Amino acid sequence: MPGGRRTSRRTGASLPERLSRHLVACGAGLVLLQLAFRAWALSGSWFYFDDLAFMSRAMNQPLDSSYLLESYGGHLMPGGFLVVYGLTKAAAFSWVWWAAVLLVMQALAGVGMLRLLLSMFGRTPFVLALLTGYLSFVFTLSAGIWFAAGINQLPLQIALVFGLHAHLAYLRHRRVRSLVACLLWTAFGLLFYEKTLLLFGIYALVTVGWFSHGRTPERLRHVWDHYRTAVVSYTAVAGVYLAIYVHYGLDFSPGTSNAQPWSPIAWNLVGEAMSTALIGGPFRWEPLAVGSFADPSQLTMLVSWAAVLGVAVYAYRTRTISKRAWSLLGFTLLCNVALLASARANIVGPDIAREYRYQTESAALFVIGLGLAFLPLVGAPQVNRHREGVPFTYETPRLIASATVAVALAAAYSTSAYVDLWQDRNPSRAYFAEVRHTLEAESDRPVPLVDVGIPQTLLWAYRYPENSYSHVLRHLSRLTSYPDASTDRLFMFDDTGSLTPVRIPATRRDEAHLGCGYELKGSSTDIPLDGPVIGGGWWIKLDYEATSASSVRVVAGDDVHETELDAGEHSLYVSAEGEFDTLELSDYASDADVCVGSVTLGLPEPGRPST
């Protein structure tokens, strides 16, 4: 058995024996060490992209079924949206509380994995090696420092470790309470992430592989005869959830998976990302806007393939039923390839498979599979035994400990490199800090803003209106206003978050006139533009001079404004939408003596920063 064969020459207990006596304490120490590392990574992280959309939704929508059950990028996550709603109401844009939630979930997953490994393999020091791998691999890193990913992925990790623990307890003793516990943990995961549905496949593989016997038909008959209640319960829950997901969450066609070749996705997912992570890689990253893709060297890939294949072959040569141990990981990898082919890869291509957040469960399933490949599963009728007459060349405690430490240190290097890129390339914190600073620096508040979207480097425009100022900056509502008409003062933020006066580039102008241009007289005045206008998002800048103040009605296509013309020289800004080629002004005072000098229509842009 790995880590448990060699005894010390010195008097007293051997190192494996001492570790066995203090296994829980050592495991807890490893979990705390990982949490400290993740806390460091989170301390330099902040809200990014989908986090902003999540807060925008929570700040502007009521807490009802429409809010909770809305599909977000194909995700059905009412539990996640409920957590987001509570955090937003209590601590919008206060990162420390959101980071604390990620840490708590990571702690639960770590403790749950320790508990699961002890339940599966007993008090063997090899459990510590397995736990170290789970805690140090980069698979769960992006989910651990990016809230939008973590609120999906970490509940899946929790559901996996606690759900499988309960499922194994049911298989051993057939107690209904264990079955209920398994269903509750799985349902918990489903509230956050539809991919939790794959746990039913994992439960099935464990049941058929280790708690039945004979050929496949005999195994299936045995499962039905002995675990019928679980089969019916799991099928019912999975069927009901699948129907709910198809109704509320599915926003892509599974049939489109045939449009994207599977082989490049599988190569990126398994050959580049997964295999190199299992030896502590990938060591090298391809930076994106903020996140990073695995970008291992060819040497790293060759070493990882040799190491992974070598472990699998060695397990096969020294153990009696090691091959089935890899079925759990193989099942989820196959599902991941199919899911990426039907959704994400159709949009961004097969390189998306080099993003570890699409296979976070691989960390847990690899260490579980590694344990099953070498150790007997406690309480299972199918026992993984040593092959007679085969030497255990590579199972000394020193070798296992050295390999574990080497992988953990390598993973720490890969993790640090990823975190450095993540922390250095996220522009969100600086942008929103500058927004708040420049708004608070304005003496005349609330500041009138054009309600456009924040830069697409922070949140894509397809999330409109979630990306608009009025939604994302709802927490600053006391400092802002969003008029559809304003005199002289109208602002936007530039790409750095600095407050700037609006500039209206000339897409359309009034037809040229000498002198006054257009004098408001009679009951109404039409100002023709030099071309037709169609669509929305337009603003008009109307420069005028008036001897006295007057009310006025401005019709700009479908937008009608009842506003004021102040005395003196001013610029009036009004929004415009629809199909039109003439600006109509009416309902002004007959003695106002207003002269319109120029009219400019365009899509508003940031000007120079306000001083």
Predicted features, each with a name:
Residues 86, 110, 182, 186-202:
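Conserved beta-strand->loop/alpha-helix structural units within folded catalytic cores of enzymes
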Residues 41, 136-144, 212, 243-252, ...:
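Juxtamembrane "helix-exit" motif on the non-cytosolic side of transmembrane helices
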